[in-house]
């Protein structure tokens, strides 16, 4: 990160240490697949560099869409990995005649449907729906009414409380962001327009994120069951669903329909990515269990493990296979792509800094 700041190939200062595990994840999986720590570090570094560049690319739209996010970018590879997909799908949807009229956002739903459009009500509705779907027959639904209603209330509470909690996080982290930016500006003389890289957790409380995530939870489970060739059933991974959308919403401008369609497509494809990476993920988990005896990573015999976050990302899948499956040729391609993106980003940063100084 420091080298990229010095060479003006990024303007993001990444202090989101909590999410460094994403880079460690792809590096670890490559390490266990190749049995080489050097290949693992290579994959992690490539992932990190491209993530910082994507954070720069999305920063302006991110800051323009969300409130109180000036000077902040999101260098989290799980979020960033879906940006190219979102840009392409969003352009395709814009070209469909009449589709632009389906401009539905979370606030618009509130105005149009009143109580029915409130995130609280939608949470209750989706929670009760998931609870009912878990029952085998009508009699079981009747017997489990207290459980179903309880799940609905919990989902509704999540929809209502997460935005409020998120706003408290923003208030608490904003001074840290401002102080870090001032400190870095002093150390890097002439640096203009630096952004502080922070966790997407700051914005997962956006109503559109909550609405689309809750709608996609049952859809993703259904896709996992019906898609031919998929062998991954997401359970605990569903908690990571919220992190798909922080950088997609600025592209769709908060349109719930567009965001849902993009989420549907990327998650359907992502299930196949997880299935493909599962053997390598499982190998890594077995090694960890052998050394730590931690029951949390003990995958039973006859099963394979996977994770929606970060293994479903096209970003991690592409880096893994170019490094592992194609070795030197694939790695050469990754280096060329990364250098090309760094040069483009440097030109953009220099142009931006000249504009700011003038």
Language-model region placement:
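Hydrophobic alpha-helical bundle architecture
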Residues: 5-13, 196-280, 284
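Signature of multi-pass transmembrane helix bundles
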Residues: 1-195, 250-255, 288-358
